[in-house]
A protein has these predicted regions:
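PEST-like low-complexity, intrinsically disordered acidic/proline/serine-rich tracts
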Residues: 25-268
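Bacterial N-terminal signal peptides
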Residues: 10-22
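N-terminal secretory signal peptides that target proteins for export/translocation
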Residues: 1-7
Length: 268
């Protein structure tokens, strides 16, 4: 019977015999197992969230607000009266337009169901529902059936991306905080009393969970240099409620007929 090395290779040199023998005897060091990084996990914001006006402002979120920013305290059903813009410093043309505001123009069949932009809608007294994945987050508002898509993959809007009331939102995680930047918004109200933002408004939102995960906390900061000398910010909080979903808004423009502008009485 021939040598097994010769039988396998045909010809075996002495060095080759030693090498193969070493392999056969198992003296080679085993390869190190590859190091697998732990998957990055982020807070789960998904679920049904109802507005909660009892939550105090979050100090960590408020510290990230830019200087020269007015805090607008109108979250929920609260409305600022005419002429009160929550500390926002209006430029002359914007102030003049706001002074001409007539609330009854909103209470017409053609305007009664006109949706605001997210600048005003996010703080409204209606719940939201969040669906979350690694690529995007969807926020469904009950208010005016608005749906927001927050892209997490780094994409940017095309040059001809259309403006809308929800705009284009790109998002990223900063630790446990979701940071969202929104542009491409159609002009719409800021304070529902005559002050409208332009199509160039830029909105920065930060979302985080409370330590117990039962509250969703957010700031909404916006800048619109065409009409404002400073920035504005709102603080908004929601509480999580299991087994709930947002309802259709179903705005009926007919309700505008319940509101008519008072007419001056003719002198007798």
């Amino acid at each position: 019977m021939g040598h097994p090395i010769k039988t396998l290779l045909g010809v075996a040199l002495p060095g080759m015999v030693l090498l193969v023998g070493a392999v056969a005897c198992g003296t080679r060091e085993p390869a190190a197992a590859p190091v697998v990084a732990a998957p990055i996990t982020h807070p789960d914001l998904s679920g049904f969230w109802n507005l909660d006006m009892s939550v105090a402002r979050d100090d960590d979120l408020m510290k990230q607000v830019a200087p020269n920013t007015a805090f607008i305290d109108d979250t929920g059903p609260k409305e600022l009266p005419a002429g009160d813009f929550g500390g926002l410093q209006l430029k002359p043309a914007a102030l003049e337009a706001a002074r001409k505001w007539d609330p009854y123009t909103q209470l017409t069949p053609e305007n009664a169901c006109k949706a605001p932009s997210i600048v005003y809608a996010m703080q409204g007294p209606f719940p939201i529902e969040i669906f979350q994945s690694d690529k995007l987050i969807v926020i469904k508002l009950e208010y005016y059936d608005m749906v927001r898509i927050l892209f997490l993959d780094g994409r940017q809007p095309e040059s001809d991306y259309p403006a809308s009331k929800v705009g284009f939102s790109s998002a990223h995680w900063d630790g446990a905080t979701l940071v969202v930047e929104t542009t491409h918004l159609e002009p719409a109200t800021i304070t529902n009393n005559g002050l409208d933002h332009t199509a160039d408004v830029r909105v920065i939102e930060r979302f985080k969970l409370s330590p117990d995960g039962k509250k969703l906390l957010a700031t909404q900061e916006f800048a619109d240099p065409a009409i404002l000398e400073n920035h504005g910010v709102r603080f908004i909080a929601w509480r999580k409620e299991a087994g709930q979903h947002v309802f259709p808004y179903e705005c009926d423009p007919g309700f505008a007929g319940n509101y008519t502008k008072p007419t001056a009485k003719k002198p007798k």
